[in-house]
């Protein structure tokens, strides 16, 4: 049985985004549910915002920094995926409710190790040429090539072959069943680009110089460093089941701080954005010219445990720290109430299938409430007083730094000594890509996410043997067996049960430290409406629903 090798994603922005800027991430909207409840939140969240009634004209949309590439295989962070998801299309399509189905391709499955796709007969690239099976095979093989410099080759590790079987048909043959692959094919790894264009542009493909060629509901109009990525509706878009965008253009711009974003939305210079831990959320929530939507948590706000020795390498110590951690304080001060005390690392926004099964299992896990007296008693029995742990942080990334400081306080409350390793925002990425960096600390904060709505999409990367984010080398045979079983299971409920079995152990052992089940927040001014309030903006045609209010 092959081991679980997740996508190779360096998380540059999953980290930077989480704090230095709060302009990124969302999943569904509505008033924030109470932070005092301990049951899973599956209601009270918005999927769709009110549909537009008129043309919005030119729309300006904020991401936390400028877009650096439009090459899907290089798109591993919020600015890139927010743009690629409306320019390019995956073989399968993620819907606003985070489920997925047929997209650019129609799926049939002759056996557990064969996925057949038929490209829609009407699908064309922006230049009018048809999307062919050859384009799809080229794109998937390019994403699967570990030498291609992309971030997703690992998700294809059970693929035996990808080949065109006709002008519009292709077959993916597997070495063994892999139902995670379908989720990936509805996401960035499954996005199809035009072979002729990509080959002609070579190393310039996906850059400001070379641009891109896709089939999505928007096409690239212009891209200038410092001025953003301007996209316009594709006038010959093939899929009539999607609404036609009610806008003239949408420009994604980089907005690196809360104050600039807040002022922009209030004055109309910025029309909207998806945000994380926005310090001015309360202010905007009461502004009559602004609409704030909160939704089911998709991303994981967590402390990565990278310790291989010392106190935090011991799950009993981690459990004591968890009991000492004031998560409600973090929710109120860092997330401004837009979250809940977690039961596990992955909460309701990640339940794309078998919702009742996942919900019941989540509720069965205890809420991670603070119990300082028990934490201190447990720590005393472990005889750890005076031992030292090192936490990686960056004071230049405010929300991640605040989470790191809260974690520090919890460690100190049970008698541990804490040293902070403070690095620049630009160097924080090294904790995710450099073994020397993550090996120099015992823990560091992250805002992390999978590629589709299933908890396994993240668990496979951080708790499986060989996982790209398994920085401590943690291995558990039962987790390995459960995740492997889930990967090969066709039935949604049975697959969920396998993931839940792994989740129970991952949660009990605190392989990573869940900090907050952070609601996904969408902010728009009164000029625009229609953007889905879910995390689909990273993977599906979200801006097709956008227009004038």
Locations of regions flagged by a protein language model:
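Extracytoplasmic/peripheral linker and loop segments enriched in polar/acidic and small residues
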Residues: 52, 419-422, 426-427, 457-526, ...
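Surface-exposed binding/hinge segments that line
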Residues: 112, 154-198, 222-224
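Ligand-site clamp/hinge motif
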Residues: 236-283, 417
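Structural transition elements
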Residues: 340-381, 398-400
